[in-house]
Amino acid sequence: MANKTALMGQKKRIALIAHDHNKPDLLEWVRFNRGTLLKHELYATKTTGRILEKELDCKITIFESGPLGGDQQIGARIAEGAIDFLIFFWDPLSPLPHDPDVKALLRVAVVWNVPIACNRASADFLIMSPLMSQEYPRILPDYEGYSKRLTTK
């Protein structure tokens, strides 16, 4: 499979999601990284977004709550190339009714080579990378052949 690139701008488009048990940890991480985060476009699911909007005192594009389709809305934006980063503090110890949505979101992020941070340590490494403040040519698999596999004769 061939590759192509998608240019991430200096201003990244970052999705922030946290399960209920992880919201305090994400909030603490956001407070610590406020200055850096405010240089970028932020997106979030509903409850997380409302909390973070109040904390950061900035506009965040807010989708539905995760269990009501918000995870899938963010996944769709990733597939469209409209989100560059996924910061998703999810709870590995609590079964959730929307576990399939979580798996689908993580899968779509991997398919489109979107950086994912699932805990504070990985989020710290991503946000502190020197690549955060510069353009970055993200390598993407070229799925054109895959998309046409059943339609060509």
Predicted regions and their residues:
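Mid-chain, well-packed structural core segment of small domains
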Residues: 71-111
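Short internal beta-strands
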Residues: 39-48
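Short, acidic/small-residue loops that bind anionic groups at enzyme active sites
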Residues: 105-126
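Histidine-anchored nucleotide/phosphate-binding helix
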Residues: 24-35
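Short hydrophobic/aromatic-enriched beta-strand-loop microsegments
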Residues: 41, 58-69, 137-140
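Short, glycine-/small-residue-rich phosphate/pyrophosphate-handling segment
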Residues: 121-153
